[in-house]
């Protein structure tokens, strides 16, 4: 118990630094941009528009209100992709600071994932615009959507801790992970419905082994379908999230003392 108390004291001791790092990341993303934070809303809208044009001929007849279906999945996947790729580079990117002074190393991937979450909240504005523009039916379940955001935030933290640590020792991981993310996007029902896949084995693999499926499906249940996720999706999302966080933190803590030798 005293160990956890000590760790919480250290966390609160550096909470101001965490806030500054998150604030810096959010400001730097759109620095010197004419539209600034408007891009957080405009960018997902433009991507949604392009993907709707490209995929609508294949899937729109089978999926009601395709733009809303698309942007609800894209919003979550983009958060995971952006946050974990940023977290992966966080230790190496702050190598000079780590060499000069003591700072809890976990604070860097934590800051990257958190700043991506802030950006995701801006992106939710784009989703609401699409919902309003298409006159989509919404229910009060929409108000529960932050629950799924918390789930995928925890999951992304776990992945971010793991990736940031392994990237210190294996720099090629950045390139490998980019390929993995691309394949992962197509293996997640973002722009297609699982009902459109006739191969039951493929559907089983996606549902059983794709953790992002749980968060995309849960988010769509609340926002798009207007219902609460089933027990498998809801509780599975929590289990996967904390399992990923536990593995990520365990590996990060195990190897963090060796970072200084490689950065």
What spans do the regions from the language model cover?
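Hydrophobic transmembrane alpha-helices and immediately adjacent juxtamembrane helices
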Residues: 1-263
């Amino acid at each position: 118990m005293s160990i956890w108390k000590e760790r919480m004291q250290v966390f609160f001791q550096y909470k101001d630094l965490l806030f500054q790092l998150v604030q810096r990341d959010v400001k730097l993303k759109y620095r010197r941009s004419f539209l600034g934070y408007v891009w957080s809303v405009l960018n997902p809208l433009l991507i949604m528009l392009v993907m709707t044009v490209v995929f609508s001929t294949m899937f729109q007849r089978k999926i009601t209100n395709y733009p809303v279906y698309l942007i609800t999945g894209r919003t979550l996947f983009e958060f995971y992709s952006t946050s974990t790729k940023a977290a992966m580079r966080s230790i190496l990117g702050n190598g000079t600071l780590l060499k000069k002074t003591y700072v809890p190393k976990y604070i860097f991937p934590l800051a990257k994932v958190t700043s991506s979450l802030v950006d995701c909240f801006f992106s939710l504005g784009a989703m609401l615009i699409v919902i309003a523009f298409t006159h989509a039916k919404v229910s009060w379940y929409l108000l529960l959507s932050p629950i799924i955001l918390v789930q995928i935030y925890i999951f992304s933290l776990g992945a971010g801790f793991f990736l940031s640590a392994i990237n210190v020792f294996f720099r090629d991981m950045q390139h490998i992970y980019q390929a993995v993310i691309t394949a992962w996007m197509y293996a997640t029902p973002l722009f297609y419905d699982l009902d459109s896949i006739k191969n039951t084995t493929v559907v089983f693999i996606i549902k059983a082994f794709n953790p992002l499926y749980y968060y995309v499906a849960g988010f769509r249940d609340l926002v798009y379908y207007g219902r609460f996720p089933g027990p498998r999706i809801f509780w599975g999302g929590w289990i996967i999230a904390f399992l990923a966080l536990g593995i990520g933190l365990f590996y990060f803590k195990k190897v963090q003392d060796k970072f200084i030798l490689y950065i």
